């Protein structure tokens, strides 16, 4: 009996080893992910490599930039957008395997100041005196024309009646991490970023959080790029929805959907 169980365990171990080698043999996975996912995705890629032996290479930028690159045929296997709009765009261009689309994460929209700033916490509402808070400086934000964080920010500021006052005072960046960097370098007294960006940065502090009802929910849809739904990509896609990845995402301030 003991020999029988030993043989079963040995067979199971061999099966797992063969499965792991099969994934490794299929090569690396390329992920196009919103800039705000940089730290979390790097940690997840490292963990996946340890567990499965497969390299995950990520390209981080504004979701708009990534969606257009995928449309143009860039060699991405997975796309994670920081909003539904740019995933919709990729779907409309028939660049996405729509059966794999799923909302993976949520986030918050916050205002940050340099870590050493004397700026105190404040409440964001229709009476917020942004001109006084900026004190002659500019408000760092992802470009509201195409960057999801900037689009969320514009929507919130419009709803709160502050957009007309603030639009001439913006310092637009190519993506949300660019806006974060302006505040980290003390080139802007305040910036609008995601809560997860503030968690990932040692150079800023959160001084205010936008009311949830002031903007659409911050959501991160994930999907496999059309024609790339092989076993290795599917394994990482499933891993992103699993407990190991969830723990890392939560550590960086994301909410799990």
Swiss-Prot record:
Keyword check for Repeat: no
Classification via SUPFAM superfamilies: Periplasmic binding protein-like II (SSF53850)
CC per GO annotation: ATP-binding cassette (ABC) transporter complex, substrate-binding subunit-containing; membrane; outer membrane-bounded periplasmic space
Chief place of localization: periplasm
Compartments in which it is found: Periplasm
Superkingdom in the source lineage: Bacteria
Phenotype upon gene inactivation: Cells are unable to transport molybdate unless high levels of it is supplied in the culture medium.
Keywords, sorted A to Z: Chromate resistance, Metal-binding, Molybdenum, Periplasm, Signal, Transport, Tungsten
Role this protein plays: Part of the ABC transporter complex ModABC involved in the transport of molybdenum into the cell. Binds molybdate with high affinity in vitro and with a similar affinity in vivo. Binds tungstate with high affinity in vitro. Binds unnatural anion perrhenate with high affinity in vitro. Does not bind sulfate, phosphate, arsenate, selenate, chlorate, metavanadate, nitrate, perchlorate, permanganate or carbonate.
Name this protein carries in UniProt: Molybdate-binding protein ModA
Source organism of this protein record: Escherichia coli (strain K12)
Phylogenetic lineage: Bacteria, Pseudomonadati, Pseudomonadota, Gammaproteobacteria, Enterobacterales
């Amino acid at each position: 009996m003991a020999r029988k169980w030993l043989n079963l365990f040995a067979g199971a171990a061999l099966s797992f080893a063969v499965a792991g080698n099969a994934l490794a043999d299929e090569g690396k996975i390329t992920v196009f992910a919103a800039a705000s996912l940089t730290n979390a995705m790097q940690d997840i890629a490292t963990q996946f490599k340890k567990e499965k032996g497969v390299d995950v290479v990520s390209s981080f930028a504004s979701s708009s930039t990534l969606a257009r690159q995928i449309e143009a045929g860039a060699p991405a296997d997975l796309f994670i957008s920081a909003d539904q709009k740019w995933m919709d765009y990729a779907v409309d261009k028939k660049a996405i395997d729509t059966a794999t689309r799923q909302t993976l994460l949520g986030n918050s929209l916050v205002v940050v100041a340099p870590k050493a700033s004397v700026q105190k916490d404040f409440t964001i509402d229709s009476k917020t005196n942004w001109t006084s808070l900026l004190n002659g400086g500019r408000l760092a934000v992802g470009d509201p024309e195409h960057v999801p964080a900037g689009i969320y920010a514009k929507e919130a500021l419009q709803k709160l009646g502050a957009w007309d006052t603030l639009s001439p005072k913006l310092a637009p960046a190519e993506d949300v991490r660019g806006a974060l960097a302006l505040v980290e370098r003390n080139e802007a007294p305040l910036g609008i970023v995601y809560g997860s960006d503030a968690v990932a940065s040692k150079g800023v502090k959160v001084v205010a959080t936008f009311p949830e009802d002031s903007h659409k929910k911050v959501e991160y849809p994930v999907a496999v790029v059309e024609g790339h739904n092989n076993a290795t990509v599917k394994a990482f896609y499933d891993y992103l929805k699993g407990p190991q990845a969830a723990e890392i995402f939560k550590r960086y301030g994301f909410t799990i959907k």
